[in-house]
Design a protein with these regions (language model features):
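Extracellular "spike/adhesin" assembly and maturation modules
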Residues: 1-43
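Extracellular jelly-roll beta-sandwich "head" domains, especially the C-terminal globular C1q domain
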Residues: 27-204
């Protein structure tokens, strides 16, 4: 799999500094892909479009992964995934499973935007969180959060968050998740997403 070291190694080979006798060792198709992506980028987007929004119950104080399918006509908008030497590479937009899966090792910009309402009239602070998960392991929060206070079930509100994540240490893949936390102190609340986008693109 590609790493910053592999990128430097591939760059050295492709610029001819060690190509003649290959003193730095063999380069693989995966390394070449990683090198190419560092220049042109890997990418993926899932989105929730117009539909009939459905309520997603979030327990008091709990954080839940946003259900992109709930009443939405959304889809995998675009992605860049493929196979090199029987190994899955690139980035996979996975609307059906509420995630973007990154197979490549590198640095990715993540952008999240959500238009939403709540169905109750309580005062609730909703916190939207970008989360990552290494090959089915623990969910990690890199600190890219955004909070919105809702006091009524009326107009839509918007929330957005962004940041750069590091996938160079993952085992097989990194899942990128959009999550929402119910900040009400005592009751479950219903969150309703009208529109939303979750995107990643490679920056290094």
């Amino acid at each position: 799999m590609g790493t910053p070291t592999a990128l430097r190694k591939t760059r050295a080979v492709l610029t001819g500094t060690s190509f003649a006798d290959n003193t730095t060792g063999a380069i693989t198709a995966q390394m070449v892909r990683q090198f190419t992506e560092s220049g042109m980028g890997g990418y993926a987007t899932i989105c929730a479009k117009a539909g009939t929004p459905a309520s997603q119950a979030v327990a008091s104080g709990a954080t839940a992964t946003i259900d992109w399918n709930a009443g939405s006509t959304g889809a995998d908008a675009v992605d860049d995934t493929g196979t090199v030497s029987s190994t899955t590479v690139g980035t996979d937009a996975d609307f059906a499973n509420d995630r973007i899966r990154i197979y490549d090792k590198g640095f990715f910009m993540v952008n999240l935007g959500v238009s939403f309402v709540q169905t109750g009239t309580d005062t609730v602070i909703w916190t939207f969180r970008i989360a990552t998960q290494d090959t089915g392991g623990s969910v990690v929060y890199p600190g890219y959060d955004a909070a919105v206070q809702k006091v009524a079930a009326t107009l839509d509100n918007m929330a957005s968050a962004s940041g750069i994540i590091d996938t160079t240490g993952h085992t097989t893949y990194t899942d990128v998740l959009a999550q929402v936390k119910n900040g009400h102190g005592s009751s479950s609340e219903n969150f309703q997403m009208h529109y939303g986008q979750l995107s990643v693109f490679r920056v290094g």
